[in-house]
Amino acid sequence: MTLSPPKILLIIFSILIVVVSQSVAQDTEVSFSYNRDLRSDEVYDSKNYLTGDWGGIRGKLNNLGITPIAKYYTTILGNPVGGKKKGVQYAGLLNAYLKFDLEKLLSIKRSKFIVSGSWATGRSLSDEDIGNFFTASEVFSGRSVRLYQLFFESELLENFLRVAVGRMGIADEFSTSEIFYNYVSTAIDAHPISLAINDAAYFSDPQASWAARIHVTPTEKFYIKAGVYNSNPAVGRDSAHGVDFSFRKGVIVISEIGYLHNQKQFSKGLRGRYTFGAFYDTRKFDELASESEKQDGNYGLYWIVEQMIYREMTEDDQGLTPWAALTISPDESINTFPFFISGGFIYKGLVPNRNYDKAAFGFAYGTISDDIKDKDYELMLELTYIIQATPWLQIQPDVQWIVHPGGSSDIPNALVLGMQLVVDI
């Protein structure tokens, strides 16, 4: 018997509901979201910000339940070897958030309201000079000022259930990991790039769409979450500035199940996280071999594994953590990358007396659909080092080697050199 994609997802949802219904709620330390700038469990400390406490104003706002957050990301990258032509490009992204603690403000227990915006500048080295799929800088997000997030989130039943509704990016919560944010290339940061290449409505920072999601934590080690997101790539265009509030085209239905262990601080065991997810998009997709032909629906699967294998004795989170991610989007008639795999490792505290620095290696490899002629695969290798210069400043020199840019040997393999700066304003 052949199962259609919707039936496959229905079976997955049914299994998850049964598991949840037979479980008992317990406390957990999982944060609200993997969004790099928003952490519900983060404790306010003015020393972590470039602008400090604003003469006491920032601390007073935080006590009232209003937390302003702003981070600036910038990359300066060049390709001295290979690509379409040699070049150097700058990209910048300013993200600004207001987080309202509704329990403090309105006595609505365990609830928050988030509104955020972004200002994206610069140019893409990959688009302008290299010609590859796996764009070298995740910071480049077009050139636009836009509204980003606008959503309400609430914890229920002592954190057994979290519910969110509003404007959100799908990859802020699904198919992502904190470990991905240690990289510069979009191939890895902030989620496997194949998902967004195959489905242009698979939004991440700073793009968002109307959505609703739930997150259930039946045990300390297990979670399941599901969401419905508007599937309309046009909503994310630069000229809309994030205020195209229409709901058209279709929806992405997504679910993710995860197993976590040794997540608590000072846990004796080594931390690990294992994730599986599946999604189905109901809108119409252009066929790759003929743009005049369209197909109803698209679906994909993903797996993410990260497991610490060595921990230093001095600090809880210093040590070596390998990771891997895999995505499969079986329909080659509409998916540019039907198969994609990435992986690598992070070592925190590798250099003596640099306990907060991180060294990272990563790779990403994707096979290209047979329906796209004269293209077969693209490979990216990245070596990077994050220098935690101050509590509010990261300096990150970065090296990338891009093989088969654009999926063929027509463009010479490219060497990318440069750095990323992150300022917590």
Stretch-by-stretch model annotation:
Residues 26-28, 45, 52-68, 101-113, ...:
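Short loop/turn motifs that connect adjacent beta-strands in outer-membrane beta-barrel proteins
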Residues 28-44, 58-81, 113-115, 123, ...:
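Transmembrane beta-strand segments of Gram-negative outer membrane beta-barrel proteins
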Residues 56-58, 97-99, 151-153, 213, ...:
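Outer-membrane beta-barrel architecture
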Residues 70-76, 113-119, 163-167, 224-230, ...:
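Transmembrane beta-barrel strands of outer-membrane/channel proteins
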Residues 87-233, 335-371:
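Outer membrane beta-barrel
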Residues 262, 267-286, 291-370, 383:
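Detector for outer-membrane/organellar transmembrane beta-barrel domains
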Residues 413-425:
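Outer-membrane beta-barrel "beta-signal"
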